[in-house]
Amino acid sequence: METITLSFGFSNLQKALDIFLNDFISTYKSLLIRDNKKASGNLINSIKSLGIVYINNKIQASIELASYWKYVEYGRKPGKFPPPDKILNWVNVKPIIPRPLNGIKPTTKQLAFLISRKIARDGIKAGNQFSEALDLVWSRQKDNIENAVSLDLESEISVIKIK
């Protein structure tokens, strides 16, 4: 009994996926800006490509981004108060200028509390910019990826020889 192992190089696919990943990051950033999700710019500035890797017979494209991206994407259900320090930082960065009510102007800490209370009571609406970016980029890049796979397979199949 003899075993034949076929190995395939996917250089065209690697290039196509790199283009896909860079297009995704650019599109995601522009959608966040479009939807006014740039308070401090921390989320947008945190988005970086970690590249394409092959792990356990799968191709994985990885990006790095601020951990709170999921609240921007999926929103937040009503219930608990968000972390007060995060809301206070957001109030300071945005900047939100409190309006006086009955002649009393709230401090930034009081304003952060009021915002936190509203989030706890009503939640935060989902933004869906991540999902929208994936859909847009896939529709633009799908043909490129399919062509890259075809080119890679054609070139590899033509060099396979059994002796």
Language-model features and meaning:
Residues 1-52:
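Charge-rich, low-complexity N-terminal segments
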Residues 42-163:
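Charged, low-complexity interaction tracts
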